Regions:
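C-terminal-of-GTPase-core extension/linker across diverse P-loop GTPases
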Residues: 1-142, 147, 152
Length: 153
């Protein structure tokens, strides 16, 4: 929903008076978006409605911000996975999200910035460009970091 309706505007007024936020989402529109198969179809539908992103995406982003959460990524040959952590956590704490042994035996983290990965297109190209970071226990993980943890237990 781009503008909401009379009811949502009344809710917005109450929320504003209480210092709270409101996120207007149109359930039927979200159902229609979810029923589309491809990313391209979803994007075309959003464009036709004059929306930049779905309400579900906006809800997730707002919830992450409200809860002070961020995401780091791990990638192997068989799987790429996103992990949720609290903003401000250091590398060993984030390693512990995967497994407590990773945190206990933390040695270092190899870090690729998401923007560098997009720019160079592969881990090998990032390494070749000298953009792979080797970080220790005091590194504060950044949203979107691609992490490879080294540990010994």
């Amino acid at each position: 929903a781009k503008t909401g309706n009379d009811y949502s505007r009344r809710v917005e007024e109450v929320a504003k008076a209480e210092g709270a936020e409101v996120l207007v989402i149109a359930g039927k529109t979200e159902e229609d978006i979810a029923s589309l198969e491809s990313y391209e179809d979803k994007q075309m539908f959003l464009d036709e409605l004059g929306l930049e992103e779905s309400g579900v995406n906006r809800l997730i982003k707002k919830a992450y911000a409200l809860l002070n959460l961020q995401t780091f990524i791990t990638a192997g040959e068989m799987e790429v996975k996103a992990w949720t952590y609290h903003r401000g956590w250091k590398a060993p704490q984030c390693a512990g999200v995967i497994h407590t042994d990773f945190e206990k035996g933390f040695i270092r983290a190899e870090v690729i910035k998401y923007a560098d990965y997009i720019e160079y297109g592969s881990e090998a190209a990032v390494r070749e460009a000298g953009k792979l970071g080797i970080e220790g226990k005091d590194y504060v993980v950044q949203d979107g970091d691609i992490m490879h943890f080294r540990f010994n237990v």
